């Protein structure tokens, strides 16, 4: 038989490929086609006049170029084209027309807009124009071959219907393509062809999540190109509505089959309503409208086409004759290459190898059974499936490629991610059974190769024989060797299996004979190969297009959608499975004179018949499209839908499967547990149907869902999944859009009411917003100076310096209203230089009366005193008018007076020092120059000559002077009568003052004989609230700094203003700053106390601490309270969520908690309560201190605020030292984190002073609901009884003895040890208890360290807590208590990891904190937290019990000596201390991170690298390695400040902060006596039932407060009376025995409406008894509830008398 044969097959020209411009012979063929065009008149489309039709170009020669599917058109002479045009279509489908789009136009106008530079009509072909015209009139399916320009028709249609999507329209055009590569390709074509905004949405691109984002996306774009799954998802969940789509284009629309679950079909069946007035225009494109093996049969062909038309509500149109396409596309030559069947001896050899592989597989299965516990059935089945898949792949490659191919396939799979989809994540050799099989198989198969033959010999031409190479593979090699010499040759080989593609590509690349072929493989993204990502696929295609590769071995992913061009040879190594596959793969050969080849076994008649059938079926399909033989369609299967009417979200049975998988994937998981639903199908022969039972993961809120009895397994599966979605939505796990709640959404339910945050004017929670700072109300109360008498409350400010090296003038504080008690006794320490300080105390001194003159003098004195402090430049002129500024009395001013005092009667009576005040105000600077003393000269003994006149010595002494030569102010302390200008300058024995001044300033003294003035410089005011003390130093006396100056160079400014007054004045701004902040804190306390009586005990100073940030640089800040409040907030919210949401998993609980406690939400709630105005976030800046007499000069209003407080403003004279300007409204910048921190700090403050009750009330006041009811705690304990059947598998008594606690509710203890991989008990696991226990432990540890180390900084407090409760620390506790022995788990790998880590700790107990050794399994730490959660519930939320327990087995202080500081942090501190530079970089490869760390010291660079599972682990290892190397090469010591504090710092007794709640009584719970529940032995047999049911797990919801429980008849049992209903008791009995829940059914209903009676029956399967099903009937009752209750009583009676219930 010949090796090849040419088939005389006439291939329709409409399915032929593209021509290459670069080849010269294309030009010759092009000219032939142009001549043929001119010699004949082709019928193309519907009859119309070319001269008058709007869409045809004018009668001129118009050039056509490439467009659409990257095709090449020919120049076209319009005058020679006939007007007899015909369109092939079916008349069986009714026409769809629309008047709004009956005409072609650019953006809806006859003439294109000047902006529409791109007009796709200019390069359109005749048939494209006519098909586009039809598409504007009705829904159309264009049937044209690959390369015929279908995309260009779609582009023209978008252009013509542009008026529907251009602004201000709110609709959009959506272009659907089935693959990501095709989406990107088609989006580029559209963007290049029309001036519309095009957006891409597909896998790997930016994900639009929210409804608002999709609204913006639609508004911003006219065309959206996406995969159909994305559109289906958006329609299902109401992100996009069908009414918003004006044009819907389906590329490769043949996927829309009536009986398929393809997204195309789902979109049309569920969401497209043909009767709707707002429905999109439909346009479909396909090269084969019929798909499927059976669809091409004569009886099904018409039915398939009609069904496609019905589903898309469109007609199929094509060209009638292929002649018109001949000028645009080329037909490949179809050839068949035969190979002979294997010889008998080779066949025997192959059989021998098959048996060898089968024997290896059986041995691996036997070893697998020994490794896996009998209870771990799912793991066993999973590994069996993986093993079978690997075995089938080797057998397949052995038969199709030969022995060498099988060897390569084994090695390829062994060394790659062959089983990445389903294999357990663990890399433990014992669990890698597939690797064991592949290794043994490769070794066994390699034994068949001669030992003296090396790889190069095997790949030589002589070795191309059986059994090493199959005859099929040899034939392929021959074909490629023939074509290898052809220029510009490119080839695609199509195979049906991924393993064939990878192995064949490997073999071809290693054949010396085919070295001119450069090969790679191309498989789908869903293949499960990590190496085949979207990026790698794009890289392969680009390399193929750039001729770097010229051979692709592809699966069916290369048949359609991918932009694979210029291909000359297409080989079907494996025959196509369908006609569609035949047509699509043939369309890849687009080059002229290309070849489409089949490899066929000459002894296999089926293969020859299959090829012949492809052509026959294709011709039959073309004929059927033209002449429809029947109007019959496929039966439409209307799926059941679940719709949420509130939102419009809708899901079908088919889509519910993927939604259920998506929900399960969102459940908490790790490398040991991948949650997914498991399906079991039970055929019911007598009814001829199937029931599907879904078992959900153990951490899902429902355990099992069972479908109704349905005819097929697929229908049953859809029904069960849809019921699961319904139930999950009812439980609130899926929101009203049928989606799991996003972590980005704000959890509104935990706030008491709604709050429109966006309506706050200019004050949001964004980063860095402007807020007004509150001024105390007491400071705003004015006095009226016009009255004859003003009474002010007075307070004595006492200064006590330490040491007593200064004298401070006594001052008083005067204001209109009295201070609160806490403020009256305020005392603070002001820190000076050199460890010195001043203690300040406030004492109330009654009421002081001021007459009219006195109040004016007091006001003037304060103004002058504040000028001296802050605006001394205004005192430089010779004359300063003495009058109070009007701005001092504005509403924004503060009204208090600071005046010097005199003490009388032993300091018990105070009075204002009016002598000093009047003396100061009589100073020369405040008098006109004419009054100055100038006539006394020369100076006498009682007078001194100053620069501004002669003055009495008494006036000069204790005054403020100004020197013109040095521009400085000085306090005159004394007159140096023994020293004058001729005296030597101190510290200089030769130079006199005369010489010194002349040399420095060029000034000659005229009166050098005058005595010198001993003066003290006037210093600048500082923030004295800042902590300047060093704990290891003692305060030291500091001599005051004095200098001597000549009087004649000094200007007398203010008399009587002594240095003692100056010293006191320098303290007052710090004192008043603290007083103002304290008064604000007291005001907030009163506001809160009015609403929350429970916090009345909190002190104002505690509130002030909570309001003061670290930025204020004071000795108090909110940070420690914030750490405490943060821990309590987490605890309180966790407790609330745990009890109120029994159906939510741990991951969703965590997300909801995060939404409550995150900064954005806390900021939002704080602003709602106006808390931001109380926050103190600015340090005292003397340049920004404003008081009465020194008002703020920056007037702020809505217009000026942005300019005044612009963050980008230029620095000016109003700029403060802190970079912020203080305005008249007290605006300052706050960040949302600052506001959130204040909320948490307030929680901590109320916690310390008022306990849990006060903190909880505050949280409720601010809008965080953390309430719960005692009944919810009791219900949680009762619900744990469902785990009691598992108590027989664990020795609970031993566990309780180890924990030193006896549980009242044993089910809680059992639940705390159930890993989510264990799902043989009806569901439930420890994760919810872990969530609760984590929050409890976090608060307890915070309370512990907060009280034990009172001087610990907040950052150190957080670090210490993290180190004490991190995973390794808790895992060590779990190991020490042997908690792993009680773990319920079905993961082999997890058991092995725990065992390895336990053995490691046993051999090296101090190495657990190091990076060496096995990694610490998180499960061990989770067990500790879940135990604490169970204990917390079992003792009724008695935190004292948990505190005692925590101290007993955690003992946080015990291991402080072995505290392991993070090597990352240690390295950072080390580099900072030695000023070394460090650099870090990370790369990811094969799922692992390699971290390179560089440290540069003294010009030398030290580099280390380490690898970890994630970047953090790699960085930790690299840091540890770097520290080791540094210590080895350098003489360095590492210091740990945290360690130093712990060893040397103050340590107090540990206390539980704030717990003052009453424990919940869970001891005397009324309910089911669990001892009377028999756990029966397992019997064989299964009762069958067709009705559906749902098993719920979790806590029962607490009854509404407004509803009273109806009295029910008590069920008397041996254990005592029970107040539960019989129905509830029956449910609990089923749960406790792991039975299915009872099924209640109304079987009889009689009587008129007002006298109706009901009879119920209950069906109960006793699964542990052989085929036992109870069916109990109750008596007639007036209500359904009563009837069901009576039926339940009957069932209880039956169970008791049957011995199942004692």
UniProtKB/Swiss-Prot annotation:
ATP binds at residues 144-151. The gene is DCL4. Its cofactor is Mg(2+); Mn(2+). GO terms for molecular function: ATP binding; helicase activity; metal ion binding; ribonuclease III activity; RNA binding. It is found in: Nucleus. Residues 475-629 form the Helicase C-terminal domain. A motif (DECH box) lies at residues 251-254. Interacts with DRB4. One of its GO terms (biological process) is polarity specification of adaxial/abaxial axis. Belongs to the helicase family. Dicer subfamily. Residues 1-52, 89-120 are annotated as: Disordered. Residues 1083-1251, 1292-1436 form the RNase III domain. It comes from Arabidopsis thaliana. Mg(2+) binds at residues 1330, 1422, 1425. Residues 89-105 have a biased composition (Low complexity). Ribonuclease (RNase) III involved in RNA-mediated post-transcriptional gene silencing (PTGS). Functions in the biogenesis of trans-acting small interfering RNAs (ta-siRNAs, derived from the TAS1, TAS2 or TAS3 endogenous transcripts) by cleaving small dsRNAs into 21-24 nucleotide ta-siRNAs. Functions with the dsRNA-binding protein DRB4 in ta-siRNAs processing. Acts in the RDR6/SGS3/DCL4/AGO7 ta-siRNA pathway involved in leaf developmental timing. Plays a role in transitive silencing of transgenes by processing secondary siRNAs. This is Dicer-like protein 4. One of its GO terms (cellular component) is cytosol. Residues 932-1054 form the PAZ domain. Keywords: ATP-binding, Endonuclease, Helicase, Hydrolase, Magnesium, Metal-binding, Nuclease, Nucleotide-binding, Nucleus, Plant defense, Repeat, RNA-binding, RNA-mediated gene silencing. Residues 131-307 form the Helicase ATP-binding domain. Its main location: nucleus. Residues 656-748 form the Dicer dsRNA-binding fold domain. The record marks 1418 as: Important for activity.
């Amino acid at each position: 038989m010949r090796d090849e044969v040419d088939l005389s097959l006439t291939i329709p020209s409409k399915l032929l490929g593209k021509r290459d411009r670069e080849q010269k012979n294309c030009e010759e063929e092009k000219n032939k086609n142009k001549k043929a065009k001119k010699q004949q008149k082709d019928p193309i489309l519907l009859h119309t006049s070319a001269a008058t039709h709007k869409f045809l170009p004018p009668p001129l020669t118009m050039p056509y170029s490439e467009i659409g599917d990257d095709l090449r058109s020919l120049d076209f002479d319009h005058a020679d084209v006939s007007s007899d045009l015909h369109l092939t279509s079916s008349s069986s489908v009714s026409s769809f027309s629309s008047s709004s789009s009956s005409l072609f136009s650019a953006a809806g106008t006859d003439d294109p807009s000047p902006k529409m530079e791109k007009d796709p009509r200019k390069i359109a072909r005749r048939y494209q124009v006519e098909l586009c015209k039809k598409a504007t009139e009705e829904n159309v399916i264009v049937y044209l071959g690959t390369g015929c320009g279908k995309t260009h028709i779609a582009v023209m249609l978008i252009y013509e219907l542009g008026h529907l999507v251009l602004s201000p329209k709110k609709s959009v055009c959506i272009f659907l393509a089935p693959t990501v590569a095709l989406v990107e390709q088609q989006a580029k074509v559209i963007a290049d062809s029309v001036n519309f905004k095009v957006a891409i949405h597909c896998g790997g691109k930016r994900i639009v999540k929210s409804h608002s984002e999709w609204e913006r996306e639609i508004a911003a774009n006219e065309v959206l190109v996406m995969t159909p799954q994305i559109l289906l998802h958006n329609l299902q969940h109401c992100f996009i509505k069908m009414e918003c789509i004006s044009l819907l284009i389906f590329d490769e629309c043949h996927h829309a089959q009536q009986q398929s679950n393809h997204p195309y079909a789902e979109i049309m069946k569920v969401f497209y309503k043909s009767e709707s007035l707002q429905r999109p225009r439909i346009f479909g494109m396909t090269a084969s409208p019929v798909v499927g093996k059976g669809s091409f049969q004569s009886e099904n062909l018409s039915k398939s086409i009609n069904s496609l038309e019905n589903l898309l509500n469109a007609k199929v149109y094509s060209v009638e004759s292929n002649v018109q396409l001949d000028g645009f596309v080329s037909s490949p030559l179809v050839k068949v290459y035969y190979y002979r069947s294997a010889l008998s001896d080779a066949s025997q050899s192959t059989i021998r190898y098959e048996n060898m592989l089968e024997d290896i597989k059986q041995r691996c299965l036997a070893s697998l059974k020994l490794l896996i516990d009998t209870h771990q059935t799912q793991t066993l089945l999973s590994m069996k499936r993986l093993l079978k898949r690997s075995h089938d792949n080797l057998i397949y490659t052995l038969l199709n490629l030969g022995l060498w191919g099988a060897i390569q396939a084994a090695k390829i799979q062994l060394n790659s991610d062959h089983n990445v989809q389903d294999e357990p994540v663990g890399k433990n050799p014992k669990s890698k059974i597939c690797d064991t099989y592949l290794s043994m198989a490769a070794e066994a198969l390699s034994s068949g190769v001669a030992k003296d033959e090396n790889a190069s010999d095997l790949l030589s031409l002589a070795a191309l024989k059986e059994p090493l190479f199959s005859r099929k593979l040899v034939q392929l090699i021959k074909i490629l060797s023939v074509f290898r010499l052809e220029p510009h040759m490119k080839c695609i080989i199509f195979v049906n299996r991924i393993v064939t593609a990878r192995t064949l590509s490997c073999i071809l690349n290693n054949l010396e004979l085919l070295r001119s072929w450069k090969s790679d493989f191309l498989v789908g993204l869903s293949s499960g190969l990590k190496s085949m990502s979207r990026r790698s696929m794009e890289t392969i295609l680009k390399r193929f297009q750039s001729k770097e590769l010229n051979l692709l071995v592809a699966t069916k992913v290369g048949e359609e959608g991918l932009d694979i061009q210029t291909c000359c040879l297409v080989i079907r190594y494996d025959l196509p499975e369908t006609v569609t596959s035949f047509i699509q793969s043939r369309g890849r050969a687009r080059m002229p004179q290309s070849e489409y080849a089949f490899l066929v076994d000459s002894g296999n008649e089926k293969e020859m018949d299959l090829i012949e059938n492809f052509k026959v079926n294709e011709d039959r399909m073309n004929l059927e499209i033209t002449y429809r033989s029947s109007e019959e369609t496929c039966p439409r299967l209307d799926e059941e839908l679940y719709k949420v009417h509130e939102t419009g979200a809708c899901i079908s049975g088919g889509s519910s499967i993927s939604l259920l998988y998506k929900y399960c994937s969102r459940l908490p998981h790790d490398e040991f547990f991948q949650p997914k639903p498991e399906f079991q199908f039970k055929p019911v022969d007598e009814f001829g149907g199937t029931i599907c039972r879904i078992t959900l993961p153990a951490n899902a809120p429902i355990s099992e869902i069972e479908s109704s009895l349905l005819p097929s397994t697929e229908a049953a599966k859809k029904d069960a999944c849809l019921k699961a979605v319904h139930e999950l939505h009812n439980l609130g796990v899926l929101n009203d859009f049928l989606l799991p709640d996003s972590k980005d959404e704000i959890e509104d339910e935990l706030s008491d009411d709604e709050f429109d945050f966006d309506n706050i004017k200019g004050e949001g929670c964004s980063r860095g917003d402007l807020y007004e700072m509150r001024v105390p109300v007491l400071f705003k109360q004015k006095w009226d100076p016009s009255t004859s008498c003003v009474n002010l409350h007075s307070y004595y400010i006492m200064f006590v310096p330490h040491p007593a090296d200064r004298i401070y003038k006594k001052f008083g504080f005067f204001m209109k209203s009295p201070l609160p008690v806490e403020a009256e006794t305020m005392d603070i320490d002001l820190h000076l230089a050199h460890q010195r300080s001043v203690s300040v105390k406030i004492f109330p001194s009654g009421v002081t009366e001021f007459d009219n003159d006195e109040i004016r003098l007091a006001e003037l004195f304060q103004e002058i005193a504040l000028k001296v402090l802050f605006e001394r430049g205004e005192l430089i002129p010779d004359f300063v008018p003495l009058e109070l500024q009007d701005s001092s009395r504005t509403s924004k001013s503060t009204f208090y007076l600071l005046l010097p005092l005199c003490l009388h009667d032993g300091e018990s009576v105070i009075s204002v020092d009016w002598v000093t005040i009047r003396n100061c105000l009589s100073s020369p600077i405040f008098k006109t120059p004419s009054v100055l003393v100038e006539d006394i000269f020369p100076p006498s003994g009682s007078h001194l000559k100053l620069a501004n006149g002669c003055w009495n010595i008494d006036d000069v002494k204790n005054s403020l002077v100004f020197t013109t030569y040095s521009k400085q102010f000085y306090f005159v302390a004394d007159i140096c009568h023994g020293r004058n200008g001729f005296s030597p300058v101190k510290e200089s024995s030769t130079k006199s003052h005369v010489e010194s001044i002349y040399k420095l300033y060029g000034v000659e003294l005229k009166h050098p004989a005058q005595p010198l003035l001993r003066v003290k410089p006037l210093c600048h005011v500082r923030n004295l609230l800042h902590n300047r003390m060093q704990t290891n130093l003692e305060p030291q006396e500091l001599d005051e700094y004095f200098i001597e100056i000549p009087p004649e160079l000094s200007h007398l400014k203010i008399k009587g203003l002594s240095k003692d007054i100056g010293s006191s004045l320098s303290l007052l701004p710090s004192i008043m700053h603290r007083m103002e902040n304290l008064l604000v804190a007291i005001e907030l306390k009163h506001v809160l106390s009015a609403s929350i009586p429970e916090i009345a005990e909190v002190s104002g100073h505690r509130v002030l601490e909570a309001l003061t940030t670290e930025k204020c640089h004071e000795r108090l800040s909110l940070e420690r309270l914030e750490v405490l409040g943060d821990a309590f907030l987490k605890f309180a919210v966790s407790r609330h969520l745990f009890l109120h949401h029994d159906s939510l998993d741990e991951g969703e609980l965590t997300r909801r908690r995060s939404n409550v406690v995150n900064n954005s939400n806390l900021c939002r709630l704080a602003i709602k309560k106006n808390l931001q105005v109380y926050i103190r976030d600015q340090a005292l800046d003397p340049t920004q201190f404003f008081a009465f007499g020194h008002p703020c000069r920056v007037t702020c209003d809505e217009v000026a605020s942005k300019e005044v407080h612009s963050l980008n403003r230029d620095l000016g004279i109003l700029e403060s030292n802190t970079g912020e300007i203080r305005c008249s409204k007290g605006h300052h910048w706050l960040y949302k984190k600052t506001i959130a921190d204040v909320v948490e700090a307030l929680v901590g403050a109320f916690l310390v002073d008022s306990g849990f009750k006060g903190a909880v009330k505050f949280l409720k006041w601010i809008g965080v609901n953390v309430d719960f009811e005692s009944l919810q705690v009791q219900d949680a304990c009762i619900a744990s009884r469902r785990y009691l059947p598992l108590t027989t598998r664990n020795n609970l008594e031993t566990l309780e003895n180890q924990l030193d606690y006896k549980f009242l509710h044993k089910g809680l203890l059992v639940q705390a040890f159930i890993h989510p991989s264990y799902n043989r008990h009806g569901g439930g696991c420890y994760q919810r208890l872990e969530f609760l226990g984590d929050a409890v432990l976090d608060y307890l540890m915070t309370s512990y360290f907060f009280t034990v180390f009172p001087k610990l900084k907040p950052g150190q407090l957080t670090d210490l807590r993290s180190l004490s409760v991190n995973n390794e620390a808790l895992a060590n506790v779990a190991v020490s208590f042997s908690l792993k022995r009680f773990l319920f788990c079905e993961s082999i790998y997890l058991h092995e990891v725990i065992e390895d880590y336990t053995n490691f700790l046993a051999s090296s107990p101090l190495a657990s904190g190091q990076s060496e050794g096995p990694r610490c399994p998180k499960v061990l730490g989770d067990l500790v937290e879940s135990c604490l959660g169970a204990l917390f519930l079992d003792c009724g939320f008695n935190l004292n019990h948990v505190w005692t327990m925590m101290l007993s087995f955690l003992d946080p202080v015990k291991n402080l000596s072995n505290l392991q500081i993070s090597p990352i942090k240690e390295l950072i501190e080390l580099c900072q201390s030695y000023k070394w530079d460090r650099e870090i970089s990370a790369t990811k490869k094969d799922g692992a991170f390699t971290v390179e760390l560089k440290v540069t010291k003294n010009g030398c660079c030290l580099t280390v690298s380490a690898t970890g599972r994630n970047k953090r682990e790699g960085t930790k290892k690299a840091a540890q390695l770097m520290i080791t190397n540094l210590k080895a090469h350098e003489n360095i010591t590492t210091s740990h400040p945290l360690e130093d504090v712990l060893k040397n710092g103050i340590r107090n007794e540990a206390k539980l902060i704030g717990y003052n709640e009453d424990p919940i009584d869970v001891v005397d719970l009324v309910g089911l006596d669990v001892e009377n529940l028999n756990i029966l032995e397992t019997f064989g047999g299964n009762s069958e039932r067709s009705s559906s049911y749902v098993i719920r797990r979790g806590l029962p919801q607490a009854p509404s407060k407004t509803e009273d429980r109806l009295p029910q008849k008590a069920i008397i049992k041996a254990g005592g009376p029970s107040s539960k209903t019989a129905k509830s008791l029956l449910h609990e009995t089923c749960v406790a025995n792991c039975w299915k829940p009872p099924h209640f059914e109304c079987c009889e209903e009689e009587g008129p409406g007002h006298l109706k009676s009901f009879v119920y029956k209950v069906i109960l399967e006793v699964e542990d008894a052989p085929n036992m099903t109870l069916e109990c009937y109750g008596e007639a009752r007036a209500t359904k509830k009563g009837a069901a209750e009576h039926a339940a009583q009957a069932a209880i009676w039956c169970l008791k008398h049957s011995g199942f219930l004692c």
